[in-house]
């Protein structure tokens, strides 16, 4: 049994989402180990929980191949610092949160030196670059997965993995309060809304805004009382969206929101969105959705050959069924998107029944992944510390 008084935990988060996860994990661990010392790379949330950071987390929060190449010397220097510090400190366990390209090499070197390692948030090995699982097996004593199908994939390769549930499923109510979301957005609850979420990346906004706006125009013709909510992550993406809108749909009225995507999903009768984590959030908000995705033809050509899954959206992957329409590349047209979206907006008896049935399925999936992830993750760390994995 580990001495609770002298425990040291190495922990590295590489971006904001990881910092939030890390803070929740530290909080849960301190219930069992109030004297524990945490050291690694932390953002403001983990720092607030008492974690000591070796460098500013922003120094490793780099996205995109070009940016990674540009900052590679700095990233390698920081990784060396983390490894040297951990070998000197000899923590009882090292936890890498997400950021697999940064963390797995650290975990590999530390594990070889006899330090227990845990990787929190499975890389998408089940979807593409599946051979990475062999490196993960070498680098970690245990992987913590958000979703049950991820654990099933690790089980196939006999790699120790524990399903802990998804923190987002813990935060969002099983029955979200639409009235409250309307109040937060200063919207009239009796009106009908459709949320349009074009993604947070420049390329997503570039490729998805035209068909999504054209879809909105078709929906407006068919359902004149519908209003459109457009949450955008920052001013840069809003300007990009507005420039495209001025060319594609200058007269279409939309309600711009400063972020607030979650509230928009809760308010919306239906949502049109890019694939990714947004589709999971939309499911948890109980908003019927159509998923659309477009990219450069060559990128799509490569992706089609690399991606090994039947579906691209998380609700469909979770259900292992086509719960929500996925309109990809050539199918991501205004006519096809509007046709699928209209099904959710019909006020007929069958339309209302379809919506209710879909929301019921969303609720069942929500319950499946609502497991108090912080507590489950902390228990997994404790079990590994005590050789009970």
Curated annotation (Swiss-Prot):
What EC number(s) does this enzyme carry?
2.4.1.182
What is the main EC category here?
transferase
One cellular component (GO) term of this entry: membrane
* Keywords noted in UniProt: Glycosyltransferase, Lipid A biosynthesis, Lipid biosynthesis, Lipid metabolism, Transferase
GO molecular function annotation = lipid-A-disaccharide synthase activity; phospholipid binding
Annotated family: Belongs to the LpxB family.
Provide the protein name: Lipid-A-disaccharide synthase
């Amino acid at each position: 049994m580990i001495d609770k008084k002298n425990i040291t935990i190495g922990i590295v988060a590489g971006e904001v989402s990881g910092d939030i996860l890390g803070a929740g994990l530290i909080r849960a661990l301190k219930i069992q180990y109030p004297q524990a010392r945490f050291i690694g790379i932390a953002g403001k949330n983990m720092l607030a929980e008492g974690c000591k950071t070796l460098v500013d987390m922003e120094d490793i929060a780099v996205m995109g191949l070009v940016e990674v190449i540009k900052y590679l010397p700095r990233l390698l220097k920081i990784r060396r610092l983390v490894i040297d510090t951990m070998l000197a400190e000899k923590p009882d366990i090292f936890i890498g949160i997400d950021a697999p390209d940064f963390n797995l090499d650290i975990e590999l070197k530390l594990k070889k030196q006899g330090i227990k390692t845990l990787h929190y948030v499975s890389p998408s090995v089940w979807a593409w670059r599946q051979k990475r699982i062999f490196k993960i097996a070498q680098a970690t004593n245990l992987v913590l997965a958000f979703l049950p199908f991820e654990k099933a994939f690790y089980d196939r390769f006999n790699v120790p993995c524990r399903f802990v549930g998804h923190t987002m499923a813990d935060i969002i109510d099983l029955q979200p309060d639409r009235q409250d979301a309307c109040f937060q957005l200063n919207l009239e609850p009796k009106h009908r809304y459709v949320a349009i979420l074009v993604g947070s990346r420049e390329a997503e906004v570039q490729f998805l805004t035209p068909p999504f706006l054209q879809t909105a125009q078709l929906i407006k013709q068919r359902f004149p009382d519908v209003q459109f909510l457009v949450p955008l992550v920052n001013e840069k993406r809003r300007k990009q969206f507005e420039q495209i809108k001025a060319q594609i749909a200058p007269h279409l009225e939309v309600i711009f929101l400063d972020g607030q995507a979650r509230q928009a999903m809760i308010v919306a009768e239906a949502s049109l969105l890019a694939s990714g984590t947004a589709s999971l959030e939309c499911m948890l908000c109980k908003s019927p959705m159509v998923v659309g995705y477009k990219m450069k033809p060559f990128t799509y050509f490569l992706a089609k050959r690399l991606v090994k899954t039947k579906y691209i959206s998380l609700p469909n992957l979770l259900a292992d069924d086509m719960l929500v329409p996925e309109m990809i590349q050539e199918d991501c047209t205004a006519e096809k998107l509007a046709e699928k979206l209209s099904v959710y907006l019909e006020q007929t008896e069958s339309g209302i029944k379809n919506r209710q049935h879909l929301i019921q399925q969303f609720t069942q999936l929500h319950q499946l992944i609502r497991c108090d992830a912080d507590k489950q993750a902390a228990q997994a760390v404790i079990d590994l510390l005590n050789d009970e994995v």
